[in-house]
Amino acid sequence: MPYIYTNLFLAFLTSLLGMLIYRSHLMSSLLCLEGMMLSMFIMTSLTILNLHFTLSNMIPIILLVFAACEAAVGLALLVMVSNTYGLDYVQNLNLLQC
């Protein structure tokens, strides 16, 4: 069982490393954030199932709700930046005057 947690932790670290490397493009940053949230969701679900925490079964679902909200806001921002400037560079975000 520890191999599963090791793989999930490596998936989280790979997504974090991708976030640090490809931070200039908004689409790459959003994909890396989704990978981080997916690995956190699976890790919390497996931990709750293995340790038999019956009172905290809602934590992975709450995490998915926050991930969906983050994805919706990120995609709306991506559409707004790409329609305005034609590029998805993060440096264009401070040029938006909302």
Swiss-Prot record:
Gene Ontology annotations of biological process type: ATP synthesis coupled electron transport
Ranges that cross the membrane: 1-21, 29-49, 61-81
EC number of the protein: 7.1.1.2
Uppermost EC category: translocase
Keyword list, A-Z: Electron transport, Membrane, Mitochondrion, Mitochondrion inner membrane, NAD, Respiratory chain, Translocase, Transmembrane, Transmembrane helix, Transport, Ubiquinone
Any single GO CC term annotated in Swiss-Prot or TrEMBL for this entry: respiratory chain complex I
Catalytic activity: a ubiquinone + NADH + 5 H(+)(in) = a ubiquinol + NAD(+) + 4 H(+)(out)
Gene Ontology molecular-function annotations: NADH dehydrogenase (ubiquinone) activity
Entry's family note: Belongs to the complex I subunit 4L family.
Designated name of the protein: NADH-ubiquinone oxidoreductase chain 4L
Gene behind this protein: MT-ND4L
